[in-house]
């Protein structure tokens, strides 16, 4: 069936004011005011607070639900999907969920049952999306106050006394209503800022292709890097987007077992705790900027490709190679420190901290105790997204998790064990060889490759362009004086519109600093997030007004073939 293209249109901003009853864990919030800012027909590029607002107040769920029906009718008439923006959407939407689910099917693109990106109302007869709610929290996670500061519209403070007990019938003062209205004005002002800060961004992308800071990075790449063409050996041209998509699809795991093995051999980083000084104040501590290290990791090394299952005997050669390489050689050949890359399951006997090493002296262990758990929980030992935890537990149920016999754990780390069976890649095994020692090893199974290539241009260019833009913007931010034409050279990384306003001195210092700090640095730091995800995780469903994980969409051995993505822009080897 041909996919129906839908046009999404920002039409309103939604918020509530609530009152609390009860104390402590028994505290409950209930809504006493529903706030709606109708911004249909407004050009967000020219939005002006006050002039372009149509703020209405409703005191009951039914009153506001009637308002939603008006938006739905408007969308059907103009053949668009109305988008209603909010901040921390599910808190404000909870009073409406049960009633909305009676009349519509509900589909959510969510991080958790209380943290959604979008929530769609779907007509049961036509199976058509008729309304979308969009949580703008994921554009600026520091709060509406920070969002307002970025776009130059401070959030109102101090005008609403939350200690008072109110009901939907309690009269509200003009001052209280002014306070309540400000939050539904901050969001369109922030969207205006985004449109001016990203010249490639159009209004029809908002609430559709642009939902989060990470999606801003994706769309920046799609509109500025994806169209670039490279020559193929045949003489034909290939866009960087197509080249990257082909690479990602080629590197997807071929079987469920291969997927599980790679999940078990996760290519993540490590944290460290020094047991010997855990209860002491330590001076002269050095710290590394891990965000910048992401870009060293993205740009500064070759990536392995074309993994294939091999016999343990071949993996034994890989093992011996890894264990023979010293730290100096790794640092001198950071771009490609090893001849082979692999994912293997290995059994180690009598593992302990390496005698005479700094790790033994200071009690620094490497391997996380979470890797040895048969089940993980979101927020505790496996991120915040419950879907990732569910998919991880499916892999663990299939037997792909680390195991131990008579182990000693402390500070969330493995210090010793009579025996461990572990899933490791070449980087992790090399690191383990620096920290631990063991008496015997046995390789059970795995996959390897000796094929390495420079990292894909599609991602590398994102990093390089934003890094250069960040440095150029930093210099301007330190030297620009509002109201005066900028006297120095403006590099080509600065968007034309912003460059023109700098040259004639009309750019406000507040806008430029916000663009530098929030947009440029934010997108630069968000590149890694576009690749750090599992394309096989399940989705959400709504039942009786409650969001929950749809277990029918989990990826298992039985449905592996049907769960393959039609297209993919996530490169696992990052």
Specify the residue positions occupied by each region the protein language model found.
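Short Lys/Arg-rich cationic patches that frequently serve as NLS/NoLS or arginine-rich RNA/DNA-binding motifs
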Residues: 1-7
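Conserved acidic
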Residues: 7, 13, 22-87, 91-574
């Amino acid at each position: 069936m041909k996919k129906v293209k839908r046009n999404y249109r920002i039409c309103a901003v939604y918020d509530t004011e609530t009152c609390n009853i009860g104390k402590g864990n028994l505290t409950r919030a209930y809504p006493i005011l529903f706030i709606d800012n109708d911004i249909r027909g407004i050009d967000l590029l020219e939005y002006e607070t006050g002039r372009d607002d149509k703020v209405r107040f409703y005191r009951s769920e039914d009153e506001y639900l009637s308002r939603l029906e008006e938006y739905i009718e408007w969308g059907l008439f103009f053949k668009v999907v109305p988008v209603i923006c909010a901040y921390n959407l599910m808190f404000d939407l909870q009073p409406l969920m049960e009633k909305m689910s009676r009349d519509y099917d509900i589909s959510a693109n969510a991080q958790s049952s209380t943290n959604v990106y979008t929530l769609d109302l779907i007509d049961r007869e036509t199976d058509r999306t008729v309304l979308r709610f969009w949580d703008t929290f994921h554009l600026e996670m520091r709060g509406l106050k920070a969002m307002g500061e970025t776009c130059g519209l401070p959030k109102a403070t101090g005008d609403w006394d939350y200690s008072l007990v109110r009901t939907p019938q309690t009269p509200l003062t003009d001052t209280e209503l002014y306070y309540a209205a400000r939050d539904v004005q901050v969001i369109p002002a922030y969207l205006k800022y985004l449109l001016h800060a990203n010249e490639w961004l159009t209004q029809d992308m908002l609430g559709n292709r642009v939902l989060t800071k990470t999606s801003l990075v994706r769309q920046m790449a799609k509109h500025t890097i994806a169209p670039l063409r490279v020559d193929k050996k045949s003489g034909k041209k290939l866009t960087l987007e197509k080249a990257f998509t082909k690479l990602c699809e080629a590197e997807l795991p071929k079987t469920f077992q291969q997927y599980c093995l790679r999940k078990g051999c996760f290519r993540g980083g490590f944290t460290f705790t020094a047991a010997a000084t855990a209860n002491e104040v330590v001076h002269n501590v050095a710290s590394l900027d891990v965000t910048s290290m992401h870009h060293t990791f993205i740009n500064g090394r070759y990536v392995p490709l074309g993994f294939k299952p091999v016999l343990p005997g071949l993996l034994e050669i890989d093992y011996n190679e890894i264990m023979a390489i010293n730290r100096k050689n790794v640092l001198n050949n950071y771009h490609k420190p090893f001849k082979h890359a692999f994912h293997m399951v290995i059994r180690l006997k009598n593992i302990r901290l390496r005698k005479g090493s700094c790790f033994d002296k200071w009690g620094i262990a490497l391997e996380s105790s979470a890797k040895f758990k048969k089940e993980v929980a979101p927020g505790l030992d496996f991120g915040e997204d419950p879907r990732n935890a569910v998919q991880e537990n499916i892999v663990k149920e299939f037997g792909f998790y680390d195991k131990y016999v008579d182990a000693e754990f402390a500070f969330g780390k493995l210090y010793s064990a009579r025996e461990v069976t572990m899933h490791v890649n070449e980087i992790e095994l090399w690191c383990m060889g620096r920290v631990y020692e063991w008496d015997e090893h046995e390789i059970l199974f795995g996959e390897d490759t000796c094929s390495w290539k420079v990292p894909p241009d599609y991602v590398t260019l994102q990093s390089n362009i934003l890094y250069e833009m960040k440095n150029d913007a930093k210099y301007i931010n330190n030297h620009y004086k509002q109201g005066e034409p900028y006297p120095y050279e403006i590099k080509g990384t600065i968007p034309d519109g912003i460059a023109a306003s700098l040259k004639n001195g009309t750019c406000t210092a507040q806008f430029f600093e916000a663009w530098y700090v929030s947009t440029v640095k934010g997108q630069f730091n968000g590149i890694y997030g576009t690749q750090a995800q599992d394309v096989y995780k399940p989705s959400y469903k709504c039942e009786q007004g409650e969001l929950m994980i749809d277990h029918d969409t989990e990826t298992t051995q039985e449905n592996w073939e049907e769960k393959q993505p039609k297209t993919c822009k996530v490169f696992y080897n990052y």
